[in-house]
Amino acid sequence: MKRILLLIALAVSLCHVALAQETSSPDNFPPDDTSVVLDSTNLPIVWIDVDGKTIDRYERISARMKIIHNGKGKINYGDTVAHPGQHIDYEGYIALRYRGNTSFNLSDKKPYSFRTLERPLEQGEKKKKVSILGMGKDNNWALLAPYSDRSMIRDLLAFEFARPWMEYTPQGKLCELFLDGTYYGVFILTELVTQGTHRLDLPDPGEEGDELTGGYILEVGDNDNDTTHFVSKYHPVSGDGFVTYSDCSIFFIAKFPDSEDVTDEQHQYIQSAIDRMEDVFASKNYTNPDTGYCKYIDVQSFMDYQLVNELGHNVDAYRLGAKLYKRRNSEDQRFKMAVWDMNLAFGNCKHNQGSSTSGWVSRYNSMLYSNGDPHMVPFWWYKLISDNNYVRKRFARWAEWRNSNLREARWKATVDSLANEVTCCGAEARNSQAWPRWGIKVWPNVYISTSYADEISYLKRWITNRITWLDGILQYTPPAPTLVGDVNNDGEVNIADVTDLIDILLRGEADEETMQRADVDNDKEVSISDVTALIDIILRGNT
């Protein structure tokens, strides 16, 4: 088996090299239809001007960027001459390149990385921190290119599911992109999981003492010789823990400080910190509440990372792009996690059972090994889910998620809201004109949707079925349904509810759950018609 794995790994490596050779295109990978016209849109409009230069995957080039955004709910116009005075959200120099691995190699529509600059690269790189589309000031950004994700919202959906629970989750904004005057489609302008005042607020690590202990950002993933990495002392194990795959390794890649800036002392320290954490997980007493793994990881952070990735059944979770970060010991010596890259989640991947609505991704090492996939889940995830205390806490945490932003009405409203952004002013239609792919197989889709509405329906069905499976495994019991008209939630419908409803109307505000109960006629707004409906319910005794 080891020989087979090595041969497969070699073949994958050669394939990767062959793909990676096409790091650029003289025409910058244009869409199928380059004649798309944008008159007006609800989404921000991003113009990038490279003046005919070739964009590369690894080397950045100078470019100019301009973003028109007149504000949420307002229309942005593509013709700035006919519509002068529009709000320019950002205008300036950027350092631009392509980004991504499979999202670059296996997608016709390419994603970008850019840094905002004081001046063009030719005059000496000087980064400039700016706020873009309401996101906090920074100089490091990405333009994700939804392609295999036909909904174009899976990454944003995962971010919204995780945001109330995790210390940091990237913000992202849907937009429409022009490159040298050609329409390129719908993109997501997003923050990255990087160090920064408005992102992961980590200090620069020093060379000794407490300053050496933080901050750091690591990624579990590919061994890339162009980056600073180290290998785990411990090999991955099977989903039941009985088999150790000694011919497979787990790699940690330094993301902050990056390979150009990290010193030998810092590299040695963060490797030793990972070693200490893993040594504890490998010990017999790893569940000890005082000396065990709780001392080295923020359990709730790891749990929330697990819940959002398992909710999406993300085939890349834990093993490809998993982000860990650490502050200085004087502040918090524990590792925490952040969410990133879920465009293949939520039923959007055919391989590794990615479309299944059952099963734990954290237990997939046996399948990965059988498939010859060398990228495996670190052993400490098996150890975590083998701890009864962790499992009990996960039951409770899932219930918190389900009673909050994962209530059926709320998560469906989140999907609808994001989908509406894409469709309400024609952005999806323009994107489909530029990249006509409906009814055509795109890697690695399992469901070949024929329209945007079809894709969103599939997405909702898939999430519904996945939540049903997780509810059963995580022993979640939904609360009893609220009586229609029970505005004050006391278990009865009577004149007191009318009084409370009128009070809500007069004040014009209440918490979200109360507003939902106050929407008696279920028309998505609270108005005098709800008072009429409530009185009718009381008079008829129909609750």
Give residue spans per PLM region.
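Sec-dependent N-terminal signal peptides
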Residues: I4-L14
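Low-complexity, Pro/Thr/Ser/Gly/Ala-rich linker/spacer regions in secreted
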Residues: Q21, S35-V36, G472-D486, D511, ...
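Conserved NTP-binding catalytic cores of kinases and kinase-like/nucleotidyltransferase enzymes
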Residues: Q21-M152
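Middle-to-C-terminal accessory/interaction subdomains
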Residues: S24, L43-P44, T54-D56, S103, ...
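Internal "kinase-insert"/substrate-recognition segments embedded within catalytic cores
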Residues: E118-L121, K129-P146, W165-P170, T182-L307
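Short, well-structured beta-strand/strand-turn elements
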Residues: P164-F178, N314
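Calcium-binding motifs, dominated by EF-hand helix-loop-helix domains
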Residues: L311, L483-V487, Q516-V520
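Alpha-helical segments with a strong preference for the paired helices of cellulosomal dockerin domains
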Residues: V487-E513, N522-T543
